[in-house]
Design a protein with these regions (language model features):
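Hydrophobic/aromatic interaction determinants used to assemble and anchor large protein complexes
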Residues: 1-208
Length: 208
């Protein structure tokens, strides 16, 4: 399962990051063509990048910590005598969750406060990239975990708590951010383009 996690991160997160960098460069070029009066910087690009990058990394760390914890519980309940859950994995999971959750919660609370105080933040290209990178990573984990879960259901693999833990935790991450994005919408051409890229990429991934 660690190989699956690494493969999903390299196969999903990095391409989305490259796409995001391209979109960000295009947006900056377009802004240079626009009158300065029409630009509302909000909290500023540097601060915005800091908050969203830290939130992204912290949430991924916390979510995978929760996956380790749930995997330990599931294998203890349903693994039987053959499958003995590792306490080392549980310790790692608790450590990741204890570190990641407070960091994400603190930074995300500040991000949401900025959005409330400065409505221009809703149109931020960085915010949309944060949301859709997480949606993309979630879809990658969900697809791979669904395959593993179905293999166990049809008797092709022994029971493992990992697929079910990934399914429940990352489904929650996906649902939260999808609901958030649906409520905010896509107020600019650039943010709509990011949504379209996500939809096309997710559709292609399900076909593959």
């Amino acid at each position: 399962m660690p190989e699956m996690v690494f493969g999903l991160l390299t196969g999903t997160l990095f391409p989305l990051a490259i796409i995001g960098a391209i979109i960000y460069a295009i947006v900056q070029w377009r802004r240079r063509q626009a009158p300065l009066e029409s630009i509302d910087p909000g909290i500023g690009t540097v601060r915005r990048l800091y908050f969203y990058v830290v939130s992204l990394v912290a949430l991924i760390v916390a979510a995978n910590g929760l996956v380790q914890i749930e995997r330990y519980v599931l294998e203890g309940l349903f693994g039987g005598d053959v499958l003995s859950p590792s306490r080392g994995g549980l310790a790692v999971g608790i450590s990741l969750a204890v570190v990641g959750l407070p960091i994400w919660g603190f930074h995300w609370r500040l991000v949401q406060r900025h959005v409330t105080e400065l409505p221009v933040e809703v149109r931020s290209i960085v915010r949309k990239l944060y949301v859709y990178v997480l949606l993309g990573v979630s879809v990658g984990f969900l697809l791979a975990s669904s395959v593993s879960a179905l293999q166990w259901i049809f008797g092709a693999k022994d029971f493992s708590g990992y697929p079910w833990a990934f399914l429940t935790i990352w489904a929650g991450v996906w649902a939260y951010h999808w609901r958030l994005e649906s409520s905010e919408g896509q107020p600019t051409v650039e943010t709509l383009a990011i949504r379209r890229l996500y939809v096309y990429a997710a559709s292609l991934a399900t076909l593959v």
